[in-house]
């Protein structure tokens, strides 16, 4: 477990293997910062190949028993886990906020959306039901089973340190697999605590292992034949690498990358509602969400002029503060590199000729000059060819791309290299229906700015936002974490004929 010293001492974190906190042995460490101050608050060990292989060995041994538990018994562990998390939800939210930088209220949402998938996975006795065909041929029955893969792994990002680990771990465990989690080294304390709570809930030691690390850790998980499937969420270049490497080693993979989510604002939209949606979806969590709205597409010049004027006014009243400030709309970014990246993109937008309506580059929170803060920025008259439209910024920057008509607005997200999510704000049902059917993205919101599906539906983007044919949570999660076995059977009374040398048919 984390060893606590006095406040001036950096905490030493550990791996979690075999139900125990395991110190790192590689000699390599990463720093965990307080985004509010920029100070190092903890050190996290980075596993080498030997440490990662030890975690796989432990998981493989533990899975054999866990996979034999009946689904109801596994579901009870998930239900007890839910109760334990509820008992310390506020402490978890504050811990998450202290390492990531999102507000405590936003951290509560991070945890809640993860727990909803745990609730979904607790229905595993129903979700694992197979198919049955009685008398498919004379005296022959056919049925299918969904069986665990064995050892599976998840590589999760810094921006949702509770939600995405739970999105991956809960269905994987419910299906009878052992799960190895490699969380982000930026904010690893909440994943470690969740692993402790799973153990307290009755999960056998070794069924859930947490290993921190970098590329060597990831490559070990990808190359070891004992790991049968792997999920990833992060940047598109790494998602593509993980997917290709997993496929080359015969593994099932679901990999989710970057996004550039557009929100279409039709002339008939409720403009106040649209502005509220854009402010929250564009600047909430300092824009560090894969489902953040980063491009507003007003249709028509009058709509655009009115929208930009209202956005400018609203941005001026945003409160940026410490992550533990209950009055803050958003807090710091997760790292100094993130602040530098956001500033470079704002500089680039100016160079490309976009109109910088609100400039957040020079924002400093008094008394927190070394914190990882960036102010809200707003660009108008961005064109599709500009890099600030083509590339993911992942920060508090909203771009306005004006569309002359509906068809032009529809083309913008449809032709973009990313295809994660999109939203349309309109009062017209025909327009909304046409948009949802024709737009080329994986998730669509109608008057909903962040269309993250509920737990019993699947989450996933298209094009360069997602690699693999099965998405996260919902029915796809059960398919991803199991293999289908089909059994064809008949009994002695039907076995009296002699040898047959032709392919059997069900006559």
Question: Which residues does each predicted region cover?
Answer:
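Rossmann-like NAD(P) dinucleotide-binding subdomain of oxidoreductase/dehydrogenase enzymes
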Residues: 130-276, 403, 468
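Short, well-ordered beta-strand elements within core beta-sheets of diverse protein domains
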Residues: 41-47, 62-68, 154, 263-266, ...
